[in-house]
A protein has these predicted regions:
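TRNA-recognition modules of translation machinery and tRNA-sensing kinases, especially anticodon-binding
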Residues: 1-292
Length: 292
């Protein structure tokens, strides 16, 4: 048998000359999170597949196309984590953190796995730093997460950042938005790519994320989610913006930031620098409920 001397496609070795740089970034992220009152949580690299199906969403590209899923020797369907929120939420419930003083503020720094086309800044194995504030619906918590991310970039000396924020509402007001999107895109369905034609019924908001130039052009005039927010979600978003202004954090509202996973709700944001970004979001309660 020939000696294997090449890493699997979509993975990358971290050599000594780069390891110290990554260690510095990780240490800065950990220290900043601790300064904001967050404590580290570590979860298994694989979970029951159902956890991601329920939390991330059956209709998402992640679940349908990108997960590394297999049956173990006991016949259980197991998935390498494609993101960190679901495992953190499961640990929050299983270990009774939900019964302790709330909110519970945790952070994680994990390897994640998605079967995607490898490209610059996007590999099949990647490292995700995330923070979760469980047990609060306060807009102040959303603003704090944004401030934390901003502080990490400041300490790393990253310049040229642009913060973009949006609100995608709650499941109630988002249902009306989905209807508006379906109506808009249905008129030009034949022009959409094959993938987006499939998204039209099951998850029309994902069309706004499509990288196809034709779909992007069609989406330019699509309804904005902020026009469909209920009163509660509108007030929540207004307060997030007020808190950011009070902390002198510059931002722009971008109604095209939608994020595609089912547990996203209300505030979503991205720090954009060149071709890379740092996304964030609020998780809705259903994603945190116990399995039946």
């Amino acid at each position: 048998m020939a000696l294997i001397t090449k890493a699997i496609k979509g993975t990358k070795d971290v050599l000594p000359q780069d390891a110290y740089k990554i260690q510095y970034i990780e240490a800065t992220a950990r220290e900043t999170a601790a300064d904001f009152g967050y404590k580290e949580i570590r979860t298994p690299v694989f979970e029951h597949t159902e956890l991601f199906q329920r939390g991330v969403g059956d209709t998402t590209d992640v679940v349908q196309k990108e997960m590394y899923t297999f049956n173990d020797k006991g016949g259980r369907s197991i998935t390498l984590r494609p993101e960190g929120t679901s495992g953190a939420a499961r640990a929050f419930l299983e270990n009774g953190l939900c019964n302790e003083a709330l909110p519970q503020k945790v952070y994680y720094l994990d390897s994640c796995y998605r079967y995607e086309k490898p490209q610059a800044g996007r590999l099949r194995e990647f490292h995700q730093f995330g923070v979760e504030c469980f047990g609060t619906q306060s807009p102040l918590a959303d603003a704090e997460l944004i401030a934390l991310a901003s502080a990490i970039f400041d300490r790393l000396g990253v310049t040229g950042l642009r913060l973009e924020i949006n609100s995608i509402g709650c499941p109630t007001c988002r249902a009306k938005y989905y209807d508006a999107l379906r109506s808009y895109f249905a008129a030009r369905k034949d022009e959409l790519c094959d993938t987006c034609q499939g998204r039209l019924e099951r998850n029309p908001m994902r069309i706004l994320d499509c990288k196809s130039p034709v779909c992007q052009e069609i989406a330019k005039d699509a309804p904005a989610v902020t026009d469909y927010l209920c009163d509660e979600c509108r007030e929540h978003f207004d307060k997030v913006q007020s808190y950011l202004k009070a902390q002198n954090i510059d931002y722009t509202v971008n109604s095209r930031i939608v994020r595609g996973l089912d547990y996203y709700t209300k505030t979503v944001f991205e720090f954009v620098v060149r071709l890379h970004w740092c996304p964030g979001h609020r998780v809705r309660r259903r994603a945190l409920r116990r399995p039946d």
